[in-house]
Amino acid sequence: MSETATWQPSASIPNLLKRAAIMTEIRRFFADRGVLEVETPCMSQATVTDIHLFPFETRFVGPGHSQGMNLYLMTSPEYHMKRLLVAGCGPVFQLCRSFRNEEMGRHHNPEFTMLEWYRPHYDMYRLMNEVDDLLQQVLECQPAESLSYQQVFQRHLEIDPLSADKTQLREAAAKLDLSNIADTEEDRDTLLQLLFTMGVEPHIGKEKPTFVYHFPASQASLAQISTEDHRVAERFEVYFKGIELANGFHELTDAREQQQRFEQDNRKRAARGLPQQPIDNNLLEALKVGMPDCSGVALGVDRLVMLALGAESLAEVIAFTVDRA
C-alpha cells in the first residue's frame, strides 16, 4: 500500500480475517471453560495511579453537569471487573478497547485491544497454567517455561534484584552502557525496570513463552505479597519472542492496603512532578464488602495476533493505527 494513502487500512484484509478468527477462538476458549464474557465502561471518573501509566482525559458536559465532569479513558477494565466479582458474577473475561497516552511504535498503539480475565479461587500458578493453555492453542507454540524474577536477574545480569543496593544496580547498568540514565536515577524500582528491560527481556522467551514471576514486593501494584517470602509479590509477566504479552496478579483483596498503595503512588507522582490521579473509591468500597480470593491477568490481543501471524508490527494486524485513525 502507498505510504501516502492514509485512508487505507494499515492491515491487509487477509490479516483482518485471520484476526477475526483468533478473536472467535479466544471466545470459544473461555466459553468451553464456563467463563462469562462481560462488558464494562470505557470511561470512568477515576483512573490508575501507577506512575508508569498515562491515561487520556476528557470532559463530559451535559444535563446536570453544566460545570463538566472529568472522565478518563480506561487503561484497563480491571477496576470495573473487580466490582463485578464482588457482586457475585463468578469467573469473567472481557475483550475490550483500552487506551494509554504513551508511545506509538512497532509494539505500541495508544488504542489497543485487551483480553482480561479473573478466576475466583485460583492462585497465581493455576492462572499461569491457563494462560499457557491459551497461548499454546492460539500460537501453536511449545509449553512455556517459568522463572522467578530473581532467577532471570541472576542468570542474565549476575546480581540479586531482591538484595542489591542502588550502587550495585548502577554497576550492572554500566555493563550495559546505561550509566547516562542510571547514574542520575534515585528510584530503586526504576533502576530495576531499566535493567530488566535492557538486560533481561532480550534474552528470554526466544523459543517458547517465558513466565517471569515473583516480582519485588515494591512492584506489587494490585497483587498480594507472598506469604512465603515477603520480599516478593504474587505477580507474573509473560514474554515471547521479545514481546511482553501479559501481566497477572494473585489479586489484592484488602481495601485498606489497596488505598495505601494508591496514596503511595500519588506521592510518587507528586515527587516526579506528575499530576496526582483521582482514586477509584468505588473499587475501594467494593473491596470493603469483600472480593473473593482470585487471580487475574491482562493480555495484549494485538501483540498476540501479531505473533500468531508472524507479523513484524502491530500495524499489520490493526485495521487503523492511530496515525490513520
From Swiss-Prot:
Its EC number is 6.3.2.-. It comes from Citrobacter koseri (strain ATCC BAA-895 / CDC 4225-83 / SGSC4696). One of its GO terms (molecular function) is lysine-tRNA ligase activity. It is an enzyme of class 6 (ligase). Belongs to the class-II aminoacyl-tRNA synthetase family. EpmA subfamily. The gene is epmA. This is Elongation factor P--(R)-beta-lysine ligase. It catalyses: D-beta-lysine + L-lysyl-[protein] + ATP = N(6)-((3R)-3,6-diaminohexanoyl)-L-lysyl-[protein] + AMP + diphosphate + H(+). One of its GO terms (biological process) is lysyl-tRNA aminoacylation. Substrate binds at S76, P77, E78, Y118, E251. With EpmB is involved in the beta-lysylation step of the post-translational modification of translation elongation factor P (EF-P). Catalyzes the ATP-dependent activation of (R)-beta-lysine produced by EpmB, forming a lysyl-adenylate, from which the beta-lysyl moiety is then transferred to the epsilon-amino group of a conserved specific lysine residue in EF-P.
